[in-house]
């Protein structure tokens, strides 16, 4: 069995790890960094090259509307759900079929799954470069509070990227697995506080005898580092607006500069009590350039984000209640996600749990490490570890009067299966609609629809007589399968809730083919750039050699070398790869002739220099002899 890599597909950054022997290893990308920005950029309105990771992030200021970041916020979401979130990004979002979200780039649109697949492809390539072999399987992490549609969308992104997703696991659970692997024989209860770029999760786990059991989970999929940045962006923009009467948020380039400056200031304020935002030439008013220069203290920043910090505490209380524990029962608190570096967050966590959080894990890497360990469990490399995860939200169906009837409660350990018998609501009813929902509200309309299907062919009977058995089956990824069976006729209808993310199997297959084609195109683009760079270096070297050897070689050899170099220059300017290959061969052949001619010229000079010295030597010998004879 090949390696199963572990991928933390984050809102802001992504990370990949793999088991090597008994140890998980975080793999550095081609730029030598252990995390990769979850950013995809399209050049020339989508007609040019595509960049992923650091290269995409670096060009964001000059290309904000075609640079996609924080795509995780839109995974599995309906367009009607994203009104607020769409304001946080500079790129254009559109409504697709079935109220799905689409990203507009030039003359085409992409699904969030396709954009995420591009990031996953980058992580896959990073792992393949390190391992020296093709990677086909992965464990991918998701926020614990992701619903069915969001989990399914993540799985689809993996498929589009050419990965068989062996398991979807919750980020806090992965972090606990990484933290507790060397403590698996200890009995302990841990809280994982996970505040990332776009989501917040809190999970309570119990460890003992190699079993990692999630007792409860809670969270907020609309709360993360992006929101903290946004508070700073709004403050800076409002301060500038007071002084200059211009709203910088209406200019995509200025907004992107503000966004990057806010993120940088937030990070700096974790280590110092004050920082300065300095953005020269942020805009021009009546042709006069304007600069934004603002000092901000940590106290001011904490005041701005106080509401966000407090929003993390309610899920913590709920998770503790659901686990049936008090803070005194918690042995260790683990901080996960870059946003937990904010001192105010650390203070509030310490205050809530009445203990200092553990500093024993790297918050940026621990989730990928846990995913790699789970990959090792699946391949058999990691033994004596059992992971028992839970579903974050209840599953159920709509029943008479628009009531939401739960079949499987939140925080139920997965995999799990539950059946319940329902009946018809009217006499002679021959068909029933099964409306599958996820959520915690009492009425169906207030919960999230994740699928609908019909069971037809029910024999006519008075209401309440037919026996319809509805079965919910949740797999280890937290993804739901539903079936409905008429117990009288044995007729059954099944549905795998996959359409909840808005993509059919056929669409996924097509996107996978496109992704593979793009991967090939990207590879060819890289090869083209490499070839152009090699040609450029060859031209430089050849000209240098020609200059150095010019006087020592015959005119015809020199002329053929100059012609070959000129041909390569033209091919390089035209970016004609076939012509470059031909011209490179000619230049290399000409260089060989140059070296050979220079060598011959050198040998000829050497012989010429040697002959006079020999005759001089003879003359001296003769003179010496004569003189000697004369004295004698």
UniProtKB/Swiss-Prot annotation:
Residues 597-632 are annotated as: Disordered. It comes from the Bacteria. InterPro entries: ATPase_NBD, Chaperone_DnaK, Heat_shock_70_CS, HSP70_C_sf, HSP70_peptide-bd_sf, Hsp_70_fam. GO terms for molecular function: ATP binding; ATP-dependent protein folding chaperone; unfolded protein binding. Acts as a chaperone. The keyword Phosphoprotein applies. The lineage of its organism: Bacteria, Pseudomonadati, Bacteroidota, Cytophagia, Cytophagales. It comes from Amoebophilus asiaticus (strain 5a2). Induction: By stress conditions e.g. heat shock. The keyword Chloroplast does not apply. This is Chaperone protein DnaK. Keywords: ATP-binding, Chaperone, Nucleotide-binding, Phosphoprotein, Stress response. HAMAP family: DnaK (MF_00332). The modification Phosphothreonine is found at residue 199. SUPFAM superfamilies: Actin-like ATPase domain, Heat shock protein 70kD (HSP70), peptide-binding domain. Belongs to the heat shock protein 70 family. Residues 612-621 have a biased composition (Polar residues). Residues 597-611 have a biased composition (Low complexity).
């Amino acid at each position: 069995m090949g390696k199963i890599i572990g991928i933390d597909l984050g809102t802001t950054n992504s990370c990949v790890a793999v088991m090597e022997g008994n140890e998980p290893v975080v793999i550095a990308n081609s730029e030598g960094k252990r995390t990769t920005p979850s950013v995809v950029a399209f050049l020339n309105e989508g007609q040019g090259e595509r960049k992923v990771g650091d290269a995409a992030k670096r060009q964001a200021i000059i290309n904000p509307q075609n640079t996609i970041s924080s795509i995780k916020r839109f995974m599995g979401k309906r367009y009607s759900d994203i009104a607020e979130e769409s304001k946080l990004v500079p790129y254009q979002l559109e409504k697709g079929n079935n109220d799905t979200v689409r990203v507009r780039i030039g003359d085409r649109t992409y699904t969030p799954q396709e954009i995420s697949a591009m990031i996953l492809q980058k992580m896959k390539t990073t792992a393949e470069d390190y391992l020296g072999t093709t990677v086909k399987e992965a464990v991918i992490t998701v926020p614990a509070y992701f619903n069915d549609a969001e989990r399914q969308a993540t799985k689809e992104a993996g498929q589009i990227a050419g990965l068989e997703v062996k398991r979807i696991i919750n980020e806090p659970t992965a972090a606990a697995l990484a933290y507790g692997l060397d403590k698996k024989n200890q009995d302990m209860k841990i809280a994982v506080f996970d505040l990332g770029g776009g989501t917040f999760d809190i999970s309570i786990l119990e460890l003992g005898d190699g079993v990692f059991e999630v007792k409860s989970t809670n969270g907020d999929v609309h709360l993360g580092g992006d929101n903290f940045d946004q508070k700073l962006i709004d403050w800076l923009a409002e301060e500038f607006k007071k002084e200059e009467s211009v709203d910088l948020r209406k200019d995509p380039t200025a907004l992107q500069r503000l966004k990057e400056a806010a993120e940088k200031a937030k990070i700096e304020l974790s280590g110092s009590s004050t920082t300065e935002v300095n953005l020269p030439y942020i805009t021009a008013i009546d042709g006069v350039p304007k600069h934004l220069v603002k000092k901000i203290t940590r106290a001011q920043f904490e005041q701005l984000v106080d509401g966000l910090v407090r929003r993390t505490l309610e899920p913590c209380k709920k998770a503790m209640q659901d686990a049936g524990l008090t803070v005194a029962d918690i042995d260790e608190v683990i901080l996960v996600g870059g946003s937990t570096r904010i001192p105010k967050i650390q203070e509030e966590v310490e205050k809530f749990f009445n203990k200092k959080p553990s500093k024993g894990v790297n918050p940026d890497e621990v989730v990928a490490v846990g995913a790699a360990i789970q990959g090792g469990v699946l391949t058999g490399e990691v033994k004596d570890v059992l992971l028992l995860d839970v579903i974050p939200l209840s599953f159920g169906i709509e029943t008479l009067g628009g009531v939401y009837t739960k079949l499987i409660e939140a925080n139920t350990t997965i995999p799990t299966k539950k059946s319940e018998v329902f009946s018809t609501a009217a006499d002679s009813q021959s068909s029933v609609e099964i409306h599958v929902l996820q959520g915690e509200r009492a009425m169906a309309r207030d919960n999230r629809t994740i699928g609908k299907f019909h069971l037809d062919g029910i024999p006519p009977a008075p209401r309440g007589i037919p026996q319809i058995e509805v079965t919910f089956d949740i797999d280890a990824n937290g993804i739901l399968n539903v079936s409905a069976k008429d117990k009288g006729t044995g007729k059954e209808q099944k549905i795998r809730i996959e359409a909840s993310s808005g993509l059919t199997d056929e669409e996924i297959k097509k996107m996978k083919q496109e992704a593979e084609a793009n991967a090939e195109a990207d590879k060819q683009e890289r090869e083209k750039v490499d070839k152009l760079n090699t040609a450029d270096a060859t031209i430089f070297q050849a000209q240098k050699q020609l200059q150095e050897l010019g006087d020592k070689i015959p005119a015809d050899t020199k002329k053929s070398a100059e012609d070959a170099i000129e041909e390569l220059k033209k091919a390089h300017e035209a970016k004609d790869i076939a012509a470059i290959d031909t011209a490179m061969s000619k230049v290399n052949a000409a260089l060989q002739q140059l070296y050979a001619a220079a060598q011959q010229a050198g040998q000829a000079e050497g012989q010429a220099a040697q002959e006079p010295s020999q005759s001089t030597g003879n003359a001296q010998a003769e003179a010496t002899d004569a003189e000697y004879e004369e004295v004698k």
